[in-house]
């Protein structure tokens, strides 16, 4: 992270509400991810030397992920539009394993739940790394921030 940039962090994250709401499990994941992201993150739009803190609005448009970044006071900083193609497979696989996980926590043995959860975490890490790589040269984030952002990308997909 660029040490010289003051307040290189997010103070607010908003998801495009026009997509609608999802299941209670997905909405819970969204709320936890946003809370955790705001509590602890490292976020710096490349080329912005003024510094944050920043607000982020995530949305989907025509199979593209949009990162609209402003300063805390509302001044536009940058908008980055990313193709979702590199994330599609891992997001699809993550959806499938999450469905298995949500079913398992209701009736499966602890060892089966643990095995599914390990696979779920592995896919989540893979998606987080892919997202971090896609943001390279645009937005500098640490891995934990990328993990929470990947969760929100998945929530947008679940809604859309």
UniProtKB/Swiss-Prot annotation:
Lineage: superkingdom: Bacteria
Disulfide links within the chain: none
InterPro entries: UCP032146 (IPR008321)
Any Pfam family: UPF0262
Family that this chain belongs to: Belongs to the UPF0262 family.
NCBIfam families, sorted: PRK02853.1
Name used for this protein in its record: UPF0262 protein Oant_0325
Organism ancestry: Bacteria, Pseudomonadati, Pseudomonadota, Alphaproteobacteria, Hyphomicrobiales
């Amino acid at each position: 992270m660029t040490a010289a940039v003051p307040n290189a962090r997010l103070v607010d994250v908003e998801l495009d509400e026009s997509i609608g709401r999802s299941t209670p499990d997905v909405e819970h994941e969204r709320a936890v991810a946003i809370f955790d992201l705001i509590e602890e993150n490292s976020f710096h739009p490349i080329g912005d030397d003024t510094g944050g803190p920043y607000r982020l609005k995530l949305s989907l448009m025509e199979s593209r992920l949009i990162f609209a970044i402003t300063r805390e006071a509302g001044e536009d900083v940058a908008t980055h539009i990313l193709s979702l193609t590199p994330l599609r497979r891992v997001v699809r696989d993550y959806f499938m394993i999450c469905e298995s996980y949500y079913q398992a926590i209701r009736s499966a043995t602890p060892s089966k739940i643990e095995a599914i959860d390990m696979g779920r975490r592995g896919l989540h890490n893979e998606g987080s790394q892919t997202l971090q790589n896609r943001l390279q040269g645009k937005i500098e984030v640490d891995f934990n921030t990328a993990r929470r952002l990947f969760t929100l990308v998945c929530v947008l997909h679940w809604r859309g």
